[in-house]
């Protein structure tokens, strides 16, 4: 797995890749393993910070990064490099990242580091996305299972990450905290288990 510096986590141009399909005959798990491994997949256009299979409205997810402001490189990374690996996807550019409140304010964006069970919740809002993001974080008190959130430029306005030690720990709050937040008009959730899950061959 890629070793990512703390600086890379919150600098540069970030995007979230929602993998809808892979080339016929390929297995999504094999594709994800390949793009997540810097020894098997590297590009001068960008890098994969995290990738996993997912269960929900898409079959895989990747968090990718290009150099600051280099949209051309990001497009090459998605439409040439990832496409060549068989990745058919929807995507969103990451905007403002949620920042914790208080004296030691820190950025807290989705899919940086988290426990094994994860819910990635795409949120559409009819209000100010930054205000809705802050309200969702407030409902969790900046604590687990809330891991982070970002404004996104794509089909949804926000991406929120919940993570915990069980599936219930991340699925129940989608219904009780996120969907009930003022300004939320729809959510779209996929789940990721980042522990070992494949049957040994």
Predicted regions span which residues?
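A compositional/biophysical signature of low hydrophobicity enriched in polar/charged and small residues
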Residues: 1-201
């Amino acid at each position: 797995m890629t070793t990512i510096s703390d600086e890379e986590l919150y600098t540069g141009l970030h995007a979230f890749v929602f993998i809808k399909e892979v080339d016929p005959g390929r297995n999504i798990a094999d594709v994800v393993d390949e793009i997540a491994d810097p020894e098997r997949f590297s590009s001068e256009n960008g890098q994969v910070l995290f990738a996993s299979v997912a269960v929900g409205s898409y079959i895989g997810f990747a968090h990718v990064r290009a150099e600051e402001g280099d949209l051309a490189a990001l497009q090459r990374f998605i439409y040439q490099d990832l496409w060549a690996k068989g990745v058919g996807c929807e995507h969103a550019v990451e905007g403002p990242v949620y920042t914790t409140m208080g004296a030691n304010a820190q950025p807290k964006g989705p899919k940086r580091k988290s426990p094994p069970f994860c819910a990635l919740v795409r949120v559409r809002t009819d209000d100010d996305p930054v205000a809705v993001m802050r309200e969702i974080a407030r409902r969790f008190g900046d604590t687990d299972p809330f891991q982070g959130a970002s404004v996104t430029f794509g089909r949804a306005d926000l991406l929120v990450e919940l993570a915990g030690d069980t599936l219930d720990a991340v699925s129940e709050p989608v219904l009780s905290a996120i969907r009930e937040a003022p300004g939320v008009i729809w959510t779209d959730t996929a789940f990721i288990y980042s522990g070992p899950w494949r049957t040994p061959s």
